[in-house]
Amino acid sequence: MKKLINLISEEVTKAFVSAGYDEKYGKVTLSNRPDLCEFQCNGAMAAAKEYKCAPFMISDKVAALLESDEMFESVESVKPGFLNIKMDTAFLAKYMNDMKDDEGRYGLEKAKKPLTIVVDYGGPNVAKPLHVGHLRSAVIGESVKRIAKFMGHNVIGDVHLGDWGLQMGLIITELRERKPDLVYFDESYTGEYPKEAPFTISELEDIYPTASGKSKSDESFKEAALLATKELQGGRRGYQALLSHIMNVSVTDLKRNYENLNVHFELWKGESDAQPYVPGMVEMMKEKGFAHMSEGALVVDVKEDTDTKEIPPCIILKSDGASLYSTTDLATLVMRMKENNPDRVIYLADARQSMHFIQVFRCARKTGIVPDTTELVHIGFGTMNGKDGKPFKTRDGGVMRLEYLLKEIDDEMLNKIKENQKEKENLNIDEAEAEQTAKTVALAAVKYGDLSNQASKDYIFDIDRFTSFEGNTGPYILYTIVRIKSILSKYEAKGGDISALKDAIMPAVNAGQKNLMLSLAKFNATIESAYEESAPHKICAYIYELANAFNGFYHDTKILSEENEELKKSYISLLVLTKEILEACIDMLGFSAPDRM
């Protein structure tokens, strides 16, 4: 289906051409004065310069040609030369029925040429718990992935684990100090290693920070960790077996935590998976003359003549031969081109890493790791701050674990749901349902609270505001969906058959209903724009507008008590479409709605 605004533009453009003017002046936009009209065209103002006449003479001619067009209720020429447009309610009702018939798509066309897109998000380090700093990458990345999937593309989400380098040597060295008798440290051992890990996730989460602290104050410990890292990367059997245990224990816990966030990765690759590609990549860069030595390090120059600021070279290997994040990211691109051959790779990472990605992207292009046809995108996000405007911390100033934050919000929502239950005596929700509902609503509060902000901007994580059932919040959106579900349930309980409603939506009978239809009609344009700009906040803004439009219609209209049966069916059919579109949108944002609250 064509976007409503495009259909309107086509009609207005035809009128401009019929009146003797260039088609470029027929573009229509949403009205910036909704009190006067629904859409507007300012083309006559620009055309007046070319055709050397007063703009209102042009707008008068165009308006006269559109006077009898069935698409419009009215097209008014307003001095000095604007066209104010109102939609015909019958045309709008047909557009609604067409959207409803287009099951699961609602007028949004699928991509004609589906792309293969890799989304690199999450990026946790193994052996360390997820903290609040991991929230934005996970939440924004999951939504960007889901939006692209809804558009019809083949999308692969990769967690890109931090599982390489000194941190592994630190863990092995600390474990050796704690449990020196473990068979993994016996170099003469040739048998099979135990299948069960010699530590729990709790122990592992204590081992890493302890080891990290020691390495800063104890030089001999750091040297032992560096040696362990080298031996691990050199293939020492016992250390390889320990690495396998570290990965299994850590990834199991990470999956549990991401599951609680409703975040799912197609690939669980780590930096270690890219390491086999490093030697060949480095050799290629040397052979082809891309890489050269600078102050002992191997670098690739990536500055360009058009640069307005200094872009340092991309370091491939340090002076001691060690690789860096840039090395791993480039080798990961080599691996992805070989295994996935993506048309686009999207990275979700802190906006402060923008220089790193400029260097990596330029190096990848210059050295031919990726062809010109593959798009590389960095979505840089701002920080999540506390009410004091500083990065979000625990009450004692530490970094808050993500699961503790989610638990805090779950508890807050559970209290609100129980209070709501006391106020509504007929709402009998048992403890298990209340807890599940609280989790569902809390997740919406967290995700919507994040995603409703433009990704690049910092935002204040305000638990009180995010968990409110009023205003621009996740719980308000869910409350609206639950309200619609309740009306539909009552309709069916009285014998109504929702599945039999075909082309039932009739022309709007009041302003609230027309406003709801106009909001629904924006769905395809909104999702297309959110995809093109990788901007989930546009979907949040849309569903807030849609929820407000529905609630306005609900308060102005007797729905279930409507005596005219055809009109009641029209209302119910419109509610079904509203519910389905809201549900499709929140699914793209990565959360769902309960049946009642």
Swiss-Prot record:
<keyword id="KW-0547">Nucleotide-binding</keyword>
<dbReference type="GO" id="GO:0005524">
    <property type="term" value="F:ATP binding"/>
</dbReference>
<dbReference type="Pfam" id="PF00750">
    <property type="entry name" value="tRNA-synt_1d"/>
</dbReference>
<comment type="subunit">
    <text>Monomer.</text>
</comment>
<dbReference type="Pfam" id="PF03485">
    <property type="entry name" value="Arg_tRNA_synt_N"/>
</dbReference>
<dbReference type="GO" id="GO:0006420">
    <property type="term" value="P:arginyl-tRNA aminoacylation"/>
</dbReference>
<keyword id="KW-0963">Cytoplasm</keyword>
<dbReference type="InterPro" id="IPR005148">
    <property type="entry name" value="Arg-tRNA-synth_N"/>
</dbReference>
<dbReference type="InterPro" id="IPR001412">
    <property type="entry name" value="aa-tRNA-synth_I_CS"/>
</dbReference>
<comment type="similarity">
    <text>Belongs to the class-I aminoacyl-tRNA synthetase family.</text>
</comment>
<keyword id="KW-0067">ATP-binding</keyword>
<dbReference type="InterPro" id="IPR014729">
    <property type="entry name" value="Rossmann-like_a/b/a_fold"/>
</dbReference>
<dbReference type="InterPro" id="IPR001278">
    <property type="entry name" value="Arg-tRNA-ligase"/>
</dbReference>
<dbReference type="GO" id="GO:0004814">
    <property type="term" value="F:arginine-tRNA ligase activity"/>
</dbReference>
<dbReference type="InterPro" id="IPR009080">
    <property type="entry name" value="tRNAsynth_Ia_anticodon-bd"/>
</dbReference>
<dbReference type="InterPro" id="IPR036695">
    <property type="entry name" value="Arg-tRNA-synth_N_sf"/>
</dbReference>
<feature type="short sequence motif" description="'HIGH' region">
    <location>
        <begin position="124"/>
        <end position="134"/>
    </location>
</feature>
<keyword id="KW-0436">Ligase</keyword>
<protein>
    <recommendedName>
        <fullName>Arginine--tRNA ligase</fullName>
        <ecNumber>6.1.1.19</ecNumber>
    </recommendedName>
</protein>
<dbReference type="Pfam" id="PF05746">
    <property type="entry name" value="DALR_1"/>
</dbReference>
<dbReference type="InterPro" id="IPR035684">
    <property type="entry name" value="ArgRS_core"/>
</dbReference>
<dbReference type="InterPro" id="IPR008909">
    <property type="entry name" value="DALR_anticod-bd"/>
</dbReference>
<keyword id="KW-0648">Protein biosynthesis</keyword>
<keyword id="KW-0030">Aminoacyl-tRNA synthetase</keyword>
<dbReference type="GO" id="GO:0005737">
    <property type="term" value="C:cytoplasm"/>
</dbReference>
